Regions:
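C-terminal non-catalytic interaction/assembly regions of soluble proteins
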Residues: 108-197
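Short, ordered loop/turn segments at secondary-structure junctions
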Residues: 1-3, 68-71, 96-99, 145-148, ...
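Gly-rich Lys/Arg/Thr-decorated short loops/hinges at beta-loop-alpha junctions or inter-strand turns
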Residues: 1-7, 32-35
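Accessory alpha-helical/coil subdomains and C-terminal extensions
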Residues: 11-37, 41-138
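Short beta-strand elements at the ligand-binding edges of bilobed clamshell
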Residues: 5-14, 153-156
Length: 197
């Protein structure tokens, strides 16, 4: 989560669960094609929490690319080539924030944040170019589950978490607090002043 003073927000567990399913599909697809590569772009403009957590949950991902880690495209392509030579398939999970490492901004949004194009097709093209340059054929299947990950009903864990958040909001209001957000920090529900966020 990239919200200050909030270690967990609602929807995270559901997003990870749905993303894991897409990674599973990418794994099946990559194994079902000769020299198959499943490339999955997951949400995370500035943070790779969903991508990293779904990677851990799936157990099928070979490369997890997040904006928090240094990224060297050439070194990645060499590692991917070695993986393909050895195993004949690979699954790559990448957070959309990786765009800041491999692309130039196309402008700025109203808040002043740099705007980047879609990193998924960009990386897919670079992978295909690399393998073509070394005379090796690969079949890259690109998955962009953005809306399917965002548009599902909350799972049981998130439903219970939201119920607890709402209960805490009522307790805070009844205690006379205003202009606060209910957060979750180190296992405890907290009241965070909105001006601190």
């Amino acid at each position: 989560n990239d919200i200050p003073f909030v270690s967990r927000s609602f929807g995270f567990a559901t997003a990870v669960e749905e993303a894991r399913e897409v990674l599973r599909c990418a794994h099946v697809e990559s194994k079902g094609n000769p020299n198959g590569i499943g490339l999955v772009r997951l949400m995370g403009r500035s943070a790779g929490f969903v991508c990293a957590s779904a990677t851990l949950a799936s157990g099928d991902v070979n490369f997890c690319l997040v904006p928090e880690a240094d990224f060297d495209l050439k070194a990645f392509l060499i590692s991917l080539e070695k993986r393909m030579d050895k195993r004949g398939h690979a699954v790559i999970a990448l957070a959309e924030g990786l765009a800041s490492k491999v692309m130039e901004p196309s402008g700025f949004d109203p808040s002043g944040n740099p705007k980047y194009g879609d990193v998924g097709p960009n990386l897919k093209a670079r992978i295909e170019e690399h393998f073509k340059s070394v005379s090796k054929q690969v079949s890259v299947k690109y998955f962009d589950p953005s809306y399917s990950v965002r548009s599902v009903p909350a799972n049981s864990e998130d439903s219970i978490f939201c119920w607890n958040l709402s209960r805490q909001a009522v307790y805070g209001a009844m205690a006379g607090y205003t202009e606060f957000c209910v957060g979750h920090w180190h296992g405890y529900f907290t009241f965070v002043p909105i001006k601190m966020m």
